[in-house]
Amino acid sequence: MEETVEAMYKKLISRIHREVLKPTGFKKDGSNFRICYDNGLGKIINFQRSMFNCNAECKFCINMGLYTQQDGQEPNPRFKEYDCAVRERAAHISPKYGKDYWWCIFEGRDMEKLFSELQAILTEDVLPWMDRFESRQDVIRTGQ
């Protein structure tokens, strides 16, 4: 029996966590990967599936965000990407894409090639972009 596209997606997300994001401190929560700091800054990478997915294909994009805990606010270790002060799509900041982009999994897709493509955008674009922000104040200074 061939693997479903949903199973292929889940396996891909688990591998991305294990090999790319977990070594940098991100914790997995479904399709969300978060890292929280004691200084009130949180970072999230979210894999958003298309609402139009079907059994034959699974499209997804990569969202990212910078969360800032407000003074006097209780910490929220399960913040969502839409809770963030700064939000961006991974493809928007990548010189390779520069626009909205949705990756697609389908029967026969070369998953090793797809993993390599995602690993590249995460390590070359997303994580370095996020590393520019080390504190809440860095996010506030961006004016976003």
Language-model segments: residues:
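Short glycine-/small-residue-rich flexible loop motifs, especially phosphate/cofactor-binding loops
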Residues: 18
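Pyridoxal 5′-phosphate
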Residues: 21
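Intrinsically disordered, low-complexity regulatory regions enriched in serine/threonine/proline
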Residues: 1-9, 14, 28, 35-144
